[in-house]
């Protein structure tokens, strides 16, 4: 019954075909019984993960300033290998042809092209300027103030996914409690928020008077960002020499 079986995995426009010929090599016979070597199932799923997982991989990002930068971070596709091995074992036991997506521990925006798609928040830490693109259209840009470099709170670069968004949060740390209207964390305790205690943003403020790592934004910009972001939206932070206080093109 395995000889004519076909299981097709789809990842966007890409396909992986597991056919009877390959399944046949996973079988063993004992006492007139056919059994499947489960380690072969796990190995196959592991090979899918190493081919299609994008989390923590390096990828290029074309900045709004023109040049490309390389970013990596926890954002990206990640196959749930344990869950998928169990699902594949079940599909094989049923002996039916199946076309399916693998089980994911984490999803991204796209399988084709860049996994971050065309809706994301772009954060130029050098220029202290950010953008939000929605389906390729720029809907927001704003100066900001990031982590205080002189105190060792430099905001790290990387590609992340927004964790959640919350109104009226109080951000607490050692020796401070800051009430904010809009809170949007994306990298552990680092997130975007309004900063009513500041009246200037951008430039080189961050070097000596920056935040504890968060992206401090003007109220109106934080509000617009809050209204348009969602859990999982890509947040791409980078440094780009030559754009200090630079204008976006």
PLM regions and their residue ranges:
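Surface-exposed, secretory/extracytoplasmic low-complexity segments enriched in Ser/Thr/Asn/Gly/Pro
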Residues: 1-177, 182, 229-231, 236-242, ...
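Active-site scaffold segments
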Residues: 183-237
């Amino acid at each position: 019954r395995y000889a004519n079986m076909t299981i097709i995995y789809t990842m966007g426009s890409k396909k992986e075909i597991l056919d009877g010929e390959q399944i046949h090599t996973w079988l063993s016979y004992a006492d007139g019984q056919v059994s499947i070597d489960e380690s072969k199932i796990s190995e196959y799923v592991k090979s899918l993960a190493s081919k299609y997982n994008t989390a923590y991989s390096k990828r290029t990002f074309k900045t709004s300033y023109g040049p490309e930068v390389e970013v990596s971070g926890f954002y990206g596709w990640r196959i749930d290998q344990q869950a998928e091995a169990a699902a594949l074992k079940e599909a094989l036991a049923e002996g039916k042809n199946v076309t399916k997506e693998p089980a994911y521990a984490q999803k991204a925006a796209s399988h084709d092209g860049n996994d971050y798609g065309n809706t994301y928040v772009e954060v130029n830490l050098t220029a202290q300027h950010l953008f939000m693109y929605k389906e390729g259209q720029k809907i927001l840009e704003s100066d900001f103030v990031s982590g205080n470099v002189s105190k060792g709170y430099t905001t790290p670069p990387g590609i992340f996914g927004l964790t959640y968004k919350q109104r009226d949060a109080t951000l607490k740390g050692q020796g401070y409690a800051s009430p904010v209207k809009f809170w949007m964390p994306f990298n552990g305790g680092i997130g975007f928020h309004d900063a009513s205690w500041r009246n200037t943003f951008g430039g080189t403020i961050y070097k000596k008077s920056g935040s504890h790592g968060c992206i401090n934004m003007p109220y109106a910009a934080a509000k617009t960002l809050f209204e348009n972001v969602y859990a999982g939206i890509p947040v791409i932070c980078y440094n780009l020499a030559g754009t200090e206080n630079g204008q976006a093109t």
